[in-house]
Design a protein with these regions (language model features):
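Short acidic, hydrophobic short linear motifs in intrinsically disordered regions
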Residues: 47-59
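A short, conserved structural fragment
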Residues: 76-86
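Short, cationic-aromatic polyanion-contact patches
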Residues: 86-109
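Short amphipathic alpha-helical interaction segments
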Residues: 62-77
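General nucleic-acid-binding
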Residues: 1-8
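Short helix-to-turn junction characteristic of helix-turn-helix DNA-binding domains
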Residues: 41-45
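Amphipathic alpha-helical dimerization/coiled-coil segments
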Residues: 13, 18-22, 106-119
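Short alpha-helical segments that sit at the start of domains
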Residues: 11-40
Length: 119
């Protein structure tokens, strides 16, 4: 089997596993915009960057600031993010992951590992 075929199969396995993860009742149902926003936030958090609400609203050129702000609210309601107030300027709030978001990222990472394993 060629490398490109192996990579294709691995990727499709990963997508299948992600769909299964999204059906687990432990994790809230997220629409594509929420999922994209959480993914972009996860990249920033992985790089140990603090992300203010204002910065989060501008993370993607594909998502309007208003839509991003609405989705931040819904992600907060779903228990995926929290807001921490800046210690110096109380007007600034930082978006931080909850334990549930961390578990979600772990589940996705495990899906990558599982998809890459030969069958």
């Amino acid at each position: 089997m060629s490398d490109s075929a192996k990579h294709s199969i691995t990727y499709l396995r990963f997508l299948h596993l992600v769909q299964a993860i999204r059906q687990i009742p432990t994790f809230p149902k997220m629409d594509p915009v929420e999922d994209r926003l959480l993914t972009m936030l996860g990249v920033k958090w992985h790089d140990a960057q603090q992300v203010s609400v204002l910065e989060a609203m501008g993370l993607s050129t594909e998502i309007s600031a208003t839509t991003a702000h609405r989705r931040l609210k819904t992600l907060r309601q779903k228990g995926m993010i929290e807001l921490d107030i800046d210690k110096i300027d109380s007007r600034v709030k930082y978006v931080v992951p909850t334990e549930l978001a961390r578990k979600y990222f772990v589940a996705l990472g495990q899906a990558i590992d599982k998809a890459a394993q030969p069958t």
